[in-house]
Design a protein with these regions (language model features):
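N-terminal glycine-rich phosphate/pyrophosphate-binding loop and immediately adjacent elements
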Residues: 2-143
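Mid-domain catalytic core of redox enzymes
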Residues: 259-376, 511
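Rossmann-like flavin
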Residues: 96-209
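C-terminal segments that line or cap access tunnels to active or ligand-binding sites in enzymes
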Residues: 334-434
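A conserved FAD-binding loop/helix module that cradles the flavin
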Residues: 55, 473-495
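A glycine-rich dinucleotide-binding beta-alpha-beta segment and adjacent secondary-structure elements
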Residues: 188-203, 356-363, 419-477
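Helical element adjacent to the flavin cofactor pocket in flavoenzyme catalytic cores
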Residues: 218-272
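Helix-loop-beta segment of a Rossmann-like dinucleotide-binding subdomain
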Residues: 155-169, 206-242
Length: 511
């Protein structure tokens, strides 16, 4: 089979890049090590329960046009769509001193804050007014039009000059942190804690480590488009991308573990699979993390040999700091007398501890409140997770006991929402950093790079090795579903002529 491109990994970044290239007419093969596509966004089933393995919070996936969500833009390009369920409030934050409802409607959100701290609500409004003009400027430049090389400049100047001019007053915060804006506008400690928490939920870092455009986009999109859950769970998103890939002639191969990226005469020329198969293509795109692509782990060799990259580049890349891994609970519970249950919750156990402390901040998703088909009749499906360091975890005789112990903060968090949850259990699955690393093939099971705003930038899709490109959460623009979809768009568009992208935009009516 003659191929134009091989994509390693079927996370959302990899599937997006592959499907876009197929849409452009390339012959593309995606090699996925796992038996299920989707990477951190895959769904899995146990005893009639359908679980999201990772993300469950989405906005801008529905029918509103135009959508600013890069993932929705890709689905439009592919001719695919999703059935979604809108909801509000979008969640509840449970602090030691009380529970706070979080609304996507900006006015209701500020009203809820004002009931706790009237002055803080005014400061929050000033904070949002500093960020939302950045969103208004960015919204006029669809991600689907962008690329990651010098040819972006004539595209921006030729098609989006008015939008660029709108950004000029905000240049100071585009590469700045949310913390910089917060320090200027917000003194109230409760609101500062709220902003830190929302940044942490987005990026894995607090306000001073999170770039301002990321939060501007979040604030704008959840207000404009609202929040939605895809019917069928996160796996429905993966299925739509796979359908789009195949619709345009691409191929997905499961249980196809890539052992090595092949390099000849200083160029990436293909891959070798664990079963010995050799596949050749002039373009290789790695959806593996920066550490797994360049450095490997104690149990997995890197995709590239040391000598395939400049030493200084490789060493610098492997010094990229990583966010911790996770403890997970995937539970099936009886649903009687839970009629008023809502779907998203965040529990902070100790206000005097840092919210990034493992076990202190726990995220909870109960998606069967929106899609009853995810659980057997009369039951709910529950996913809870919290940060957990990889260090010290090993599959020894103490492993099962340690799993039980380290999952207790998650159970205590769930008891804030469903006090008798332990008595409702019909299925209990505990995931550890080792689970995260094994199933997702991720270095130390990490959430992604801990690249703080103002300290460094996420690298682009290009690498020093001709023919090799990267997508996913260790490339620009970073962590999160919209971001990794954007990384796939940027990579795919960079590999075709600008005219091809322009024709795509004309066909979509986005020009």
């Amino acid at each position: 089979m003659s191929l134009d491109a091989i994509v390693i990994g079927s996370g959302i970044g990899g599937l997006t890049a592959a499907a876009m290239l197929a849409r452009y007419g390339m012959r593309v093969l995606v090699c996925e090590s796992h038996a299920i596509a989707g990477g951190a966004a895959h769904s899995f089933q146990r005893r009639g329960f359908t679980f999201d393995s990772g993300p469950s919070f989405y906005c801008g996936l529905g029918k509103q046009r135009p959508s600013l969500n890069p993932l929705r833009q890709v689905l439009d390009v592919l001719g695919e769509s999703l059935q979604v369920v809108p909801y509000d409030p979008m969640g509840h934050y449970h602090f030691p001193d009380g529970t706070f409802p979080v609304y996507s409607n900006a006015e209701r959100y500020r009203e809820a804050v004002a009931r706790i701290t009237p002055e803080g609500a005014k400061e929050l409004e000033r904070f949002e007014k500093r960020l939302l003009p950045l969103y208004e400027a960015l919204r006029d430049v669809p991600t689907i039009a962008l690329r990651a090389d010098w040819q972006l400049i004539p595209v921006l100047v030729g098609r989006y000059l008015p939008s660029l001019l709108k950004m000029l007053p905000h240049l100071g915060i585009i590469q700045g942190s949310v913390g910089d804006v917060m320090d200027k506008e917000v003194r109230d400690p409760w609101v500062r804690r709220l902003i830190d928490l929302e940044c942490f939920l987005l990026s894995g870092l607090k306000a001073h480590g999170t770039i301002a455009p990321e939060v501007a986009f979040m604030l704008g999109e959840r207000t404009r488009a609202g929040v939605e859950y895809p019917v069928g769970g996160s796996g429905a998103i993966v299925d739509a991308l796979v359908r789009g890939l195949k619709r345009w002639g691409g191929e997905l191969r499961l249980n196809a573990h890539v052992e090595q990226i092949l390099v000849e005469a200083g160029k990436a020329v293909g891959v070798r699979l664990r079963n010995g198969d050799v596949l050749k293509a002039p373009i290789v795109i790695s959806n593996a993390t920066i550490w797994d692509t360049y450095g490997g782990t104690h149990s997995r060799a890197p995709l590239l040999r040391k000598e395939d990259l400049p030493q200084s580049y490789r060493e610098s890349a492997l010094k990229t700091p990583a966010v911790d891994s996770f403890m997970h609970l995937h539970l099936g519970i009886r649903a009687e007398r839970l009629e008023g249950l809502t779907g998203h919750h965040v529990v902070v156990h100790n206000a005097s501890q840092d919210i990034t402390e493992p076990g202190n901040t726990c995220m909870i998703s109960i998606p069967s409140v929106w899609d009853a088909n995810l659980a057997p009749e009369g039951h709910h499906v529950v996913h809870a997770y919290t940060l957990e360091p990889f260090e010290g975890w090993q599959r020894d005789e103490a492993y099962e006991q340690r799993k039980k112990e380290r999952s207790q903060p998650l159970f205590r968090a769930l008891e804030r929402v469903i006090p008798d949850i332990r008595q409702r259990l019909v299925l209990e699955l505990i995931g550890t950093p080792l689970s995260h690393s094994y199933y997702l093939r991720r270095y130390q099971g990490t959430y992604g790079p801990a690249i703080a705003a103002g300290k460094a930038m996420f690298p682009g899709c290009q690498t020093p090795l001709p023919g090799l490109y990267r997508v996913g959460d260790s490339t620009m623009p970073g962590i999160g579903v919209p971001a990794v979809a954007a990384s796939g768009i940027l990579c795919a568009n960079t590999l075709v002529m600008p005219q091809q992208t322009s024709e795509l935009l004309v066909n979509l009516g986005k020009n």
